[in-house]
């Protein structure tokens, strides 16, 4: 056999014989206070019930220990943390690019996508890009952004509206309205 270092798995709580205190404040299975007892007595009570003695708060004086099924406790804890992760909605910023010369059909498709993103609860970044001579007609670009703003007034709140051109583009950010 090949010898090597074993990776030590550390639990978040000490259980059974890992507890180092002499006396512990013992809590029963249902959360009822049993009182301050010797560690040996607490271990015997847990063993009688076929459960584990788990050190809940090691920094207390004396440390608080509870009689419980440690495997079930870990399972419930991981299950509840997974539930909480599921409930959290990560807000993404979706980007749609327009040009000052975007045709009506393309405009409608992009508008439909904007509506879908906002209904899903995502923020939307609308980038209006200028190329070549389009830079001379910035008013047309602002008109396009105003049209988008007016079409989405019921669904979105304007977080930022461009006052001037940045480089060769204008950027407007929309956030969904709270329901």
Curated annotation (Swiss-Prot):
**Is Glycosyltransferase included in the keywords of this UniProt record?**
no
Q: Which keywords appear in this protein's UniProt record, sorted alphabetically?
A: Cytoplasm, Initiation factor, Protein biosynthesis
- The principal localisation class reads cytoplasm
One of its GO biological process terms is: ribosome disassembly
What's an example GO cellular component term for this entry?
A: cytosol
Recorded hits in InterPro entries, A to Z, give:
T_IF-3_C_sf (IPR036788), T_IF-3_N_sf (IPR036787), Translation_initiation_fac3_CS (IPR019813), Translation_initiation_fac_3 (IPR001288), Translation_initiation_fac_3_C (IPR019815), Translation_initiation_fac_3_N (IPR019814)
Give the GO molecular function terms. ribosome binding; translation initiation factor activity
Q: Where is this site: Important for 30S binding?
A: 107, 110
Q: Which domain of life is it from?
A: Bacteria
Under the heading Pfam families, the entry gives: IF3_C, IF3_N
Where found, per UniProt?
Cytoplasm
Tell me, in a sentence or two, what this protein's role is.
IF-3 binds to the 30S ribosomal subunit and shifts the equilibrium between 70S ribosomes and their 50S and 30S subunits in favor of the free subunits, thus enhancing the availability of 30S subunits on which protein synthesis initiation begins.
Family that this chain belongs to: Belongs to the IF-3 family.
Subunit-level organization: Monomer.
Can you say what this protein is called?
A: Translation initiation factor IF-3
- Species in which this protein is naturally found: Buchnera aphidicola subsp. Schizaphis graminum (strain Sg)
């Amino acid at each position: 056999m090949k010898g090597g270092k074993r990776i030590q798995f550390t639990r978040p709580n000490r259980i059974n014989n890992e507890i180092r205190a002499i006396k512990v404040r013992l809590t029963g299975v249902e959360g009822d206070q049993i009182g301050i007892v010797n560690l040996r007595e607490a271990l015997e009570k847990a063993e009688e019930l076929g459960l584990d003695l788990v050190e809940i708060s090691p920094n207390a004086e004396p440390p608080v220990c509870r009689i419980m099924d440690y495997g079930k406790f870990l399972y419930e804890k991981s299950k509840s943390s997974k539930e909480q992760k599921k409930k959290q909605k990560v807000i993404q910023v979706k980007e749609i690019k327009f040009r000052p010369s975007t045709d009506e059909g393309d405009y409608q498709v992009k508008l439909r996508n904007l509506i879908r993103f906002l209904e899903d609860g995502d923020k939307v970044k609308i980038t209006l890009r200028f190329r070549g001579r389009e830079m001379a007609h910035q008013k047309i670009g602002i008109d396009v952004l105003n049209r988008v703003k007016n079409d989405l007034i019921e669904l979105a709140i304007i977080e930022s509206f461009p006052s001037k051109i940045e480089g060769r583009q204008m950027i407007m950010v929309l956030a969904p309205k709270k329901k």
